[in-house]
Amino acid sequence: MLEEFKKFALKGNVLDLAVGVIIGGAFGKIVTSLVNDIIMPILGLVVGGINFTALEYVLTEKGSEPIVLRYGQFIQTTFDFLIIAFSIFMFIKVLTKFKKKEEEKPASAPKPSKEEMLLSEIRDILKEKAN
């Protein structure tokens, strides 16, 4: 059973998936930082100094705890998603372009088999004798 698991875990697809998940997690952190620390402050400045993470709507009812709808945080998370989705789209587009270029390369002429080479030699010898 251990051997079976070892074969499964060391297959190329499983390792590729693991690497993809790790890189994807790190990329997600980079995008979150980009949105939180660069894009949203600039966007907040453009629209009048608004801090999007602080945007919220509070629903209150007498005698109960208030319910807070943090729509600013939702806007920020939506920006995260859009940037990640666009980045993945561009990556797939570039990857597809490279794959198409590889497929379009003409295949080199196949090397003649031993039989074909022998037949060519026999033909050449017969031509020489005829002349």
Curated annotation (Swiss-Prot):
Subcellular localization(s) per the UniProt record: Cell membrane
GO terms assigned for molecular function: mechanosensitive monoatomic ion channel activity
Keyword Iron belongs to the record: no
Database matches in InterPro entries: Mechanosensitive_channel_CS, MS_channel, MSC/AndL, MscL_channel
Transmembrane keyword on record: yes
Keyword line: Cell membrane, Ion channel, Ion transport, Membrane, Transmembrane, Transmembrane helix, Transport
Any Pfam family hit: MscL
Stretches that traverse the bilayer: 8-28, 30-50, 72-92
Disulfide-bonded cysteines: none
Main location (coarse class): membrane
Recorded topology in the membrane: Multi-pass membrane protein
GO cellular component, one term: plasma membrane
SUPFAM superfamilies on file: Gated mechanosensitive channel
Family, per entry: Belongs to the MscL family.
Quaternary context: Homopentamer.
UniProt cross-references to PANTHER family, sorted A to Z: LARGE-CONDUCTANCE MECHANOSENSITIVE CHANNEL (PTHR30266:SF2), MECHANOSENSITIVE CHANNEL MSCL (PTHR30266)
HAMAP family: MscL
Described purpose of this protein according to its UniProt entry: Channel that opens in response to stretch forces in the membrane lipid bilayer. May participate in the regulation of osmotic pressure changes within the cell.
Identification of the protein by name: Large-conductance mechanosensitive channel
Organism from which the protein derives: Alkaliphilus oremlandii (strain OhILAs) (Clostridium oremlandii (strain OhILAs))
Upper classification of the organism: Bacteria, Bacillati, Bacillota, Clostridia, Peptostreptococcales
